[in-house]
Design a protein with these regions (language model features):
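Glycine-rich beta-alpha-beta "Rossmann" dinucleotide-binding loop(s) and their flanking helix/strand
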Residues: 130-140, 253-256
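Hydrophobic or amphipathic alpha-helical targeting/insertion segments
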Residues: 20-23, 32, 141, 147-148
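An anion/pyrophosphate-binding glycine-rich loop and adjacent beta-alpha core
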Residues: 144, 150-259
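Flavin (primarily FAD) binding-site architecture
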Residues: 119-133
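Extended, hydrophobic alpha-helical segments in both membrane/secreted and soluble proteins
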Residues: 117, 137-144
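Glycine-rich active-site loop/strand segments that organize a redox cofactor
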Residues: 1-16
Length: 259
């Protein structure tokens, strides 16, 4: 609630806190294999504005692993028709009620009737020049709902993540906050911390860290900030963040040697 600067919906926060444990149990039942400690307990890490280690993970590909498990389970359900490569272009609305969708399937336009329509299209990161979102996240789900007459709220709440790998002619790649949670530090060209004055420093709320980094870059007339991994033992870094390290190495970067 504090990290939300007083803007959090209290009921939503309470719902998350109360129901998170049983949701995790359900994911485990579905086959989600979170990382574990040597004693078999669930391994947790620290992220921004958290006072305790509570974030479950699967190395540095938690989201990918979660989607794989849920997709596999969904496709096992009888009576489910799964359509890939089909784009929804319009919601079908009659008498103020959504009763289906119009889809583009190759060169064909098709209407599909449904008793219920759920839009789960992700965000709109690709409305911005720089984003780590997948290419499909262009805000189309929100636009579809708005065009059909749905009430839209809280569009101003766009999260700007502080750390990403930004190189010429390459998509932005997210550098997980968990890297800082495991001991990495943000540094400027002289090795000083641009977030030292923030409560929580490298793990202050994301909006505060993002603003501090932007302010530092403007003052120093630079377009990037470094991330010093020296606080993470090499073996631990290789085990926890193989995807991030592999992506960096594809571009001849080794964050374990040079911020």
């Amino acid at each position: 609630m504090h990290a939300g600067a007083g803007l959090c919906d209290g009921d939503s926060v309470r719902l998350l806190v109360d129901q998170a444990p049983q949701c995790v149990d359900r994911l485990l039942q579905l086959g989600m294999e979170f990382d574990r400690n040597r004693d078999g307990s669930l391994a947790t890490t620290l992220e921004a504005a958290h006072s305790h280690h509570r974030v479950l993970h699967v190395q540095d590909r938690t989201g990918h692993a979660l989607v794989d498990v849920l997709r596999e389970r969904a496709e096992q359900r009888p009576g489910l028709l799964h359509r890939r490569g089909v784009r929804v272009s319009q919601l079908w609305v009659e008498h103020g009620r959504c009763c289906g969708v119009q889809v583009v399937d190759g060169s064909r336009l098709q209407w599909i009737r449904s008793r219920a329509v759920v839009l789960a299209t992700g965000g709109g990161g690709h409305l911005y020049t720089n984003t780590t979102n997948p290419a499909q996240a262009a805000g189309e789900g929100v636009a579809l709902a708005w065009s059909a007459g749905a009430a839209i709220e809280d569009l101003e709440f766009v999260q700007f993540h502080p750390t990403a790998l930004k190189l010429p002619d390459a998509p932005c790649f997210l550098i997980s906050e968990a890297v800082r949670g495991e001991g990495a530090r943000l540094v400027d060209a002289s090795g000083q911390s641009p977030v030292a004055d923030l409560h929580g420093a490298d793990l202050a709320p994301r909006d505060q860290v993002s603003r501090a980094l932007l302010r530092c870059m403007r003052e120093q007339h630079t377009d990037h900030i470094g991330l010093d991994w020296s606080g993470i033992p090499r073996e631990q870094a290789e085990r926890r963040f193989p995807t991030i390290l592999e992506r960096c190495r594809q571009h001849n970067l080794n964050p374990l040697e040079q911020p």
